[in-house]
């Protein structure tokens, strides 16, 4: 993220879910999923952010 958008940080908004906010089969209940966004919350970056996550092995 820092190489793609200088000054923008990666935000992890949720990892483990114990409150039941995700669908029943969600990997959040196993600690194998995260919800991420950027510090500027610019939704136009989400496609590229997804690609970066896949390229990083997530």
UniProtKB/Swiss-Prot annotation:
InterPro entries: Hedgehog (IPR001657), Hedgehog_sig/DD-Pept_Zn-bd_sf (IPR009045), Hedgehog_Signaling (IPR050387), Hedgehog_signalling_dom (IPR000320). Keywords: Autocatalytic cleavage, Calcium, Cell membrane, Developmental protein, Hydrolase, Lipoprotein, Membrane, Metal-binding, Palmitate, Protease, Secreted, Zinc. GO terms for molecular function: calcium ion binding; patched binding; peptidase activity. One of its GO terms (biological process) is tissue development. One of its GO terms (cellular component) is extracellular space. SUPFAM superfamilies: Hedgehog/DD-peptidase. Signal peptide: none annotated. It is found in: Secreted; Cell membrane. Ca(2+) 2 binds at residues 14, 17, 19. N-product is active as a multimer. The sonic hedgehog protein N-product binds calcium and zinc ions; this stabilizes the protein fold and is essential for protein-protein interactions mediated by this domain. This is Sonic hedgehog protein. It comes from Pseudorasbora parva. The lineage of its organism: Eukaryota, Metazoa, Chordata, Craniata, Vertebrata. The gene is shh.
